[in-house]
Every structure is written in structure tokens, then in C-alpha cells.
UniProtKB/Swiss-Prot annotation:
UniProt keyword terms in alphabetical order: Phosphoprotein
Alphabetical list of Gene3D superfamilies matching this protein: Carbohydrate binding type-21 domain
GO biological process: negative regulation of glycogen catabolic process; positive regulation of glycogen biosynthetic process; regulation of glycogen biosynthetic process
PROSITE patterns reported in the protein's UniProt record: CBM21
Comp. bias intervals (Basic and acidic residues): 237-251, 297-308, 321-336, 365-374
Cellular component annotations (GO), alphabetically ordered: protein phosphatase type 1 complex
Domain (CBM21): residue spans on this chain: 525-632
InterPro entries noted in UniProt: CBM21_dom, CBM21_dom_sf, PP1_regulatory_subunit_3
Phosphoprotein in keyword set: yes
Compositional bias annotation for Polar residues: 72-91, 353-364
Encoding gene per record: Gbs-76A
Stated name of the protein: Glycogen-binding subunit 76A
Source domain of life: Eukaryota
Residues bearing PTM Phosphothreonine: 545
Length: 681
């Protein structure tokens, strides 16, 4: 099935002057025999390629018949049957944007009937069939990639790219005819402008001989310069044997790495096919090369890295490892120039001139500069090798310097006794010298082992000097007498100053009850009434603070104690909750505490209170058997030395006159006055 604009296989639109691209012309070059089955597979692949090219030419314009690629000029050179032309052809391989691809014949053909033979046909027909008639050359390499993942399983066999290269070694150095040396072209439309063409135009026979001569001339010049530079560096190496020994361990590793780079340069120079383009085609290529996409440039670099290592130059094999290390910078530049010459097809003569001039400039530099270039980032040497080389040299130099210093110190130490005069020291001279004061200790310091020779120790006993060996002192049990002279410097105050206890209060609170906790039957009272005041006293005479404690029966875990007090004879009252004392339970009773403030009382007033105990929904009272617990506010007593001023009657001081005794009893009596409320409880 053909779409409108597709080119049929049985006739041609325009005559083609090129030789027909037939299977007969390809097989002798590769050294294979024809087979009908492989030919049919080849025809299917060719039909797929023609379908792809037909769709591209339809986009550019169907009326341009001269631009349509014609592969087989006549119907006699095709193997496509009538039913094959009506079948739907799938895409064998998508269009690639690689501008730098190459023939890769380094695969081993297992046998003449191996599936690899068909793969070779597929690769060659991709090169021949995907190039338009008027395409412009752009690269010096031919396409060598396999069918893409988009191709059908029936279009071509599977090819194992990791096969060995024993059988294809014979076909490696063969060159295709000029009519078959074409490359697959990828044409893309960019915003309605002219398309990008990646590929190689067919070689023109007029320039083929010139290309070979230029390549031979370029290789001869490079080898000659490399040989001269190697000889000069060998002489320099012989004059500096010590420097070579210092870095010999590192240079051997670098030589092995750089040898591979030199061989890659040689293989690239020997086996890379190049094409000379016509002047008008070179100009068209220059315009299109500037419009290459980043993807094309990345694929170009990957294609250059895939160039296999070919047969190295004989001159390179004859070089010594040290020469290859020294000339690494030159080889890197030569490889760069050769790669640029392969990608760019402007002029081989100009590229050769630039390569030779660069080589001569490199050879004129000193060996130290060449060595620095080897370790520079531009030379391609890994940063790890650079740092390792610097570290090796630094360590070796440091070891040499340390050895020299050790030798110098050893000589100085051995020669010091001979140059100086030996001085004999005696014990007498040691005694004349001022001895250093040392801290006496009966313990060994542990710094020197016992038996180590040192200073002589001189021991003198007291009896030798006429002194007593022992000094006896007697201690008596009696209290020693202190002489008066020991107190002469002491100042004894005859009169003590009065104590300053703060401001004095003009009133005081006097309890009118006896403390229940001091009574012998206190616990019996607690057992009887379930609650009882234990004690209550004034703790602060300035603020008139009363602190007290209450003991209650342990009837239940939940219990509460309140103090009900009044300052105006029970005309009004207030309740104060007492606080439980932690860990006060003895199994029989618990203790609660409270604090009352009577600073608002005036002289002659009373503070009365009673205790209420609540437990299990019941209330228990302690009101001092109906008399309540009272504190009387009295004026404070002031005594003078002359006694001219009589203090008011006070219960605390007992200075109560006989005439006022009856009235005082009535004042202190809990039953006197209208303030008592007997029906309160």
C-alpha cells in the first residue's frame, strides 16, 4: 500500500546517473553469498525506508519529482513482488539526528548463513536508501547503528552488538565504492525554513586520491614530530635520574593510562574515513552546522567516543613509556585536531597546517611545561591522578628532608663529646653549689625505678651535732590556765545595748481558757466529743495572730474542720476552714490547724470561737463545754524606773489592785455581760 506521493519500486520518476544500489554490488564487498530469504528481508526493509522518504517528500512538496530519492533505477534490479508492494510497511528505524556515525565492522560473523548477515544488509541499505538525491554532505562517517526499538520484529533480525570481531577482520579495511558511500539523511522543517540535513554526500572520484595523499602526509608529519620530541625528552630524562626515581611509582601508572590515549589517536587517524566536499556544498554545510540542535552535538560526541582502537602506528609502538607520558599533551592536541578535521569538512589542507603548527608549538616547550600540561585539567588527566601525583611527590620530598635532618642531628650528637672538654664533677663541688629546695616526701615519686644512680644522700643524726635524739613533752588532763596577757587586746563591753525587737504594741491578747492538750484526759475528751481543740496561742504580738490546732476522730477519709469566730459578742460571726496536717493520722485521730487575726480588736473586746467537725453527714462541736474559747484584748503594761507612772491593770503582769479585783473578775468571766449567747449552738 502506497500513500499519495510515495515512489513505487517498479519505475523511476527521473533517471539516476548513480550506479544501482543492488544486493549484488554489496555482497562481494563484504564477502557473503546471496540468499533469497535474506533478499526478501532486504526488500521489506527497503520498502519501509522508501515509505518514510515518501512521507517526507510529501511534506516538502509533491510536485518536485527531481528531489525524490531513486535507489533502484530500473525494475529489473528489484526483488519486491507484486504482493509485497501492497503490504503495509512499518518503520524499521526512526530518523536519527546523529551527524557523526560510522561503519562498525568489528563484529564476528558466526557463519555465512548467520542472522548477522541480514543485519549487515540492513545497515548498508539504511545508508544507501535514506539519502536524498540532492542532499548535502555533513559528516565523514557512515551510519552504523542497528534498528531502533520502533521497528517491527518481522522487519529485521536481532543483532548482538557484543559479538567478537574475528570473522569481520578481513572486511574491516575494505572500502565501499564511491556510488555506495552515502549516509542516511535526516531532514526536519524548522518554522517553515530550510531543513537540517545530517549525513554524508557521495564521494566524488576527483577528490578521493587527494584525500588519501593528504591523510598520508598529515600522518607522516605528526609521526616525525613525535619522534623528534621523544628523542629530545629521552636526553632530558637521562640527565635527571633522581627526579625520575622520586615519581617512578606514579609515572608507571600514568604511562599505562596515557598509552591507551595514544593508541586511540592512532586508531582514529588510520581508520576514520573522510570526504572532500565541493566548495558550494561546504558553504551550505557551514550554514546548517550552525543550526544543529544540542541533541545532535551530544550524539556527535558519543559517536566520536565509540571509535574502536585500530592498529596503532609503528612509530607509536616503538616509543618508550616515559616518552608517551611526556608527549601526552601533544597527543591530546593531535587527537583534538584530528577529531575536528573529521567532523568539519571545510578543508583538509587547512586542518593539516593547523595540526602541524600546534604540534611544533607544543614541542618547543620545556619538559617541565609538558609535565604540568599532563596534570592540568585541560589535558584530560583525571583530577584524582593529579592530586595523587602531587601527594606522592610531596611525601617523597618530605621524607628526604626528614632523613637529612636526622642525619645532621646524629652527626652533631656524636661529635659533641669530641669537640668539648669533659668536666669531672665530685661530691665536694656538688656541695659548693647552691642546692635547690625540694619538697620532702616519704613516698616514692615513681618517676625513676629503684636502684637508679643519682645524687648521694647525706644523713646526719642529731646526736652527732650534740643534740638530743628525742624531745619529750608531757600532756596533762587538767584544764590549762590562761594568762591574763591573752585578754589584753580584747575589748569587753561593760553594758549590753537593749535588744531592738521592732515596734511595740500597745495592746495584747490574753487567753481566758486552759490549753486542752495539756490536760491528762485530752484523748478521752476527743473520744467522747469526736473533736477537741488541742491548743491555741498568740504567735505574733504585733499583728495579734492566733495559731491553733484541732484533733478529730478518724471516722472517715472524707472530713472537714471549720472555726467559727466572732469579734462583737456573736452579733456577727465568720467560718474559717482549718487545714489538714499531712501524715498526722495515728489511726485514731487526725490533726487540723488554723490561724486567726485579732489586730482589729480594741482594748476591752473579746475574740470568741468554737470548733465544728463534719464527717459522714454529721456535725460535731467543741465549744469548751458551752463557754467558748475566748481571747481578751488588754492594754500592754509599761514600767518606769521611778515608778511614778502606774501601769493600767493587767492580767499578764498581775498588777491588779484590790479595789479593781472584783470588777476584773467580772470582766474576765465568760458569763458576764450581754455578749454571751447561750442559745447560739
Amino acid at each position: 500500500m502506497n500513500d499519495p506521493g510515495d515512489i513505487p519500486l517498479t519505475h523511476t520518476s527521473t533517471p539516476d546517473s548513480r550506479p544501482p544500489c543492488s544486493i549484488i554490488s554489496i555482497i562481494p564487498t563484504i564477502g557473503m553469498s546471496s540468499c533469497r530469504g535474506r533478499a526478501e528481508a532486504f526488500a521489506r526493509s527497503l520498502s519501509s525506508k522508501l515509505r518514510t522518504l515518501g512521507s517526507q517528500t510529501t511534506e516538502e512538496g509533491e510536485g518536485n519529482a527531481e528531489d525524490e530519492p531513486i535507489i533502484n533505477g530500473t525494475s529489473t534490479n528489484t526483488w519486491v513482488n507484486s504482493h509485497d508492494s501492497e503490504q503495509t510497511v512499518t518503520d524499521l528505524q526512526p530518523l536519527r539526528h546523529e551527524s557523526d556515525s560510522f561503519f562498525d565492522f568489528d563484529c564476528e560473523l558466526e557463519s555465512p548463513g548467520s542472522p548477522v548477515d541480514e543485519c549487515e544488509y540492513l545497515r548498508l541499505i539504511e545508508t544507501a536508501s535514506n539519502t536524498p538525491h540532492n542532499s548535502t554532505a555533513e559528516s565523514g562517517y557512515a551510519c552504523a547503528s542497528m534498528a531502533s526499538s520502533h521497528s517491527s520484529s518481522n522487519d529485521g533480525p536481532y543483532f548482538d552488538a557484543s559479538a567478537s570481531t574475528s570473522t569481520a577482520a578481513a572486511a574491516q579495511d575494505q572500502t565501499l565504492p564511491a556510488s555506495e558511500h552515502k549516509e542516511y539523511v535526516n531532514t526536519l522543517q524548522l518554522n517553515g525554513k530550510h531543513g537540517l540535513a545530517n549525513g554524508v554526500q557521495e564521494e566524488q572520484p576527483a577528490f578521493q586520491d587527494d584525500v588519501q595523499e593528504d591523510e598520508a602526509f598529515l600522518q607522516a608529519q605528526i609521526l616525525n614530530e613525535l619522534q623528534k620530541h621523544s628523542n629530545s625528552l629521552t636526553e632530558v630524562e637521562q640527565t635527571k635520574p633522581e627526579e625520575g626515581k622520586l615519581t617512578n611509582g606514579h609515572l608507571e601508572k600514568v604511562e599505562e593510562l596515557e598509552l591507551k590515549d595514544v593508541l586511540e589517536v592512532a586508531g582514529t587517524t588510520n581508520r576514520a574515513p573522510k570526504v572532500i566536499a565541493a566548495p558550494q556544498e561546504v558553504e551550505a554545510f557551514a550554514d546548517r552546522s550552525q543550526e544543529q540542535s544540542p541533541n545532535d552535538r551530544v550524539q556527535k560526541e558519543s559517536s566520536q567516543e565509540r571509535v574502536p582502537e585500530g592498529t596503532p602506528f609503528e612509530g607509536v609502538q616503538g616509543e618508550s613509556p616515559s616518552d608517551r607520558v611526556q608527549t601526552d599533551a601533544s597527543d591530546e592536541r593531535v587527537q583534538e585536531e584530528i577529531s575536528n578535521d573529521t567532523v568539519q569538512v571545510e578543508s583538509n589542507h587547512k586542518s593539516a597546517t593547523e595540526s602541524i603548527s600546534t604540534e611544533v608549538t607544543t614541542l618547543e616547550r620545556s619538559p617541565e611545561e609538558s609535565r604540568n600540561d599532563e596534570l592540568s585539567p585541560d589535558s584530560g588527566v583525571d583530577e584524582t591522578d593529579k592530586s595523587a601525583s602531587n601527594l606522592t611527590v610531596d611525601v617523597d620530598l618530605a621524607q628526604i628532608e626528614q632523613a637529612k635532618q636526622d642525619a645532621t642531628e646524629a652527626v652533631e650528637k656524636s661529635g659533641a663529646p669530641s669537640r668539648g672538654t669533659t668536666v669531672d664533677t665530685t661530691d665536694d663541688e656538688d656541695d659548693c653549689r647552691p642546692q635547690r629546695i625540694r619538697r620532702c616526701s616519704s613516698l616514692k615519686t615513681g618517676k625513676t625505678p629503684p636502684g637508679t644512680p643519682g645524687r648521694k644522700k647525706i644523713v646526719r643524726f642529731a646526736d652527732v651535732l650534740g643534740l638530743d635524739l628525742a624531745d619529750v613533752k608531757t600532756f596533762l588532763d587538767e584544764i590549762p590556765t590562761i594568762p591574763k596577757s591573752a585578754f589584753e587586746d580584747l575589748e569587753i563591753l561593760e553594758s549590753e545595748p537593749p535588744l531592738q525587737l521592732g515596734p511595740k504594741s500597745d495592746k495584747l491578747l490574753m487567753p481566758l481558757f486552759q490549753q486542752p492538750g495539756g490536760l491528762p484526759k485530752f484523748l478521752d475528751a476527743v473520744r467522747e466529743k469526736q473533736v477537741s481543740l488541742e491548743n491555741a496561742a498568740v504567735t505574733d504580738n504585733i499583728n495579734q495572730t492566733i495559731s491553733g490546732s484541732v484533733r478529730v476522730r478518724n471516722l472517715d477519709f472524707h472530713k472537714s474542720v471549720h472555726i467559727r469566730y466572732s469579734l462583737d459578742g456573736w452579733r456577727s460571726y465568720a467560718d474559717l476552714q482549718a487545714n489538714y496536717v499531712e501524715n498526722s493520722c495515728d489511726g485514731f485521730s487526725d490533726i487540723f490547724t488554723f490561724v486567726l487575726f485579732g489586730n482589729s480588736l480594741h482594748v476591752g473586746q473579746r475574740l470568741e470561737f468554737a470548733v465544728r467537725f463534719q464527717c459522714k453527714g454529721q456535725q460535731f462541736w467543741d465549744n469548751n463545754y458551752g463557754a467558748n474559747y475566748c481571747f481578751q484584748c488588754l492594754p500592754s503594761s509599761t514600767h518606769t524606773a521611778g515608778g511614778s507612772t502606774a501601769s493600767p491593770p493587767s492580767v499578764a503582769t498581775g498588777a491588779v489592785s484590790t479595789g479593781h479585783s472584783a470588777s476584773l473578775v467580772g470582766l474576765l468571766s465568760p458569763t458576764a455581760g450581754d455578749a454571751w449567747c447561750s442559745s447560739f449552738y
